[in-house]
């Protein structure tokens, strides 16, 4: 495991953020991550890409990533510089796609307690999220080591290529 902590500013979104809100279908004529990144979350917050900085963290309500099974959604988030997504629950297919693309996501039932603009730190190894703004510490079930290895490698394809190369 390489990167144990993720530190960033929080951007809040509500529940049931579907993949079309993450990256609208009108932009799916490309699969170039940098192009997708320009439009991430555009229909939920048209100014999101302009406001956020690389390394920031999305904290959302339940059922994040519902809707279609498009892999473009986690690709766009990651390419835009979103360091992680925290929500009480994730749509099943988005959950798997996020790890396959190397985007860390964490299930936290108390995510509603974290406000937009808060500075937080996610300790992936110990399963804690520390809200540096409010000094509250939250526990989550750490992701399995294999899933952390996918994140460390930058996604499933990179992980597989590294395995083939013997790294």
From Swiss-Prot:
EC number of this enzyme: 4.2.1.33
Pfam families: Aconitase_C
Record's subunit section: Heterodimer of LeuC and LeuD.
Pathway: Amino-acid biosynthesis; L-leucine biosynthesis; L-leucine from 3-methyl-2-oxobutanoate: step 2/4
Single GO molecular function: 3-isopropylmalate dehydratase activity
Keywords linked to the UniProt accession: Amino-acid biosynthesis, Branched-chain amino acid biosynthesis, Leucine biosynthesis, Lyase
Reactions it catalyzes: (2R,3S)-3-isopropylmalate = (2S)-2-isopropylmalate
Alphabetized InterPro entries for the sequence: Aconitase/3IPM_dehydase_swvl, AconitaseA/IPMdHydase_ssu_swvl, IPMI_Swivel, LeuD, LeuD_type2/HacB/DmdB
The protein's name: 3-isopropylmalate dehydratase small subunit
Entry's family note: Belongs to the LeuD family. LeuD type 2 subfamily.
Function of the molecule: Catalyzes the isomerization between 2-isopropylmalate and 3-isopropylmalate, via the formation of 2-isopropylmaleate.
Entry's Gene Ontology BP terms: L-leucine biosynthetic process
Enzyme kind, highest EC tier: lyase
Domain of life, per lineage: Bacteria
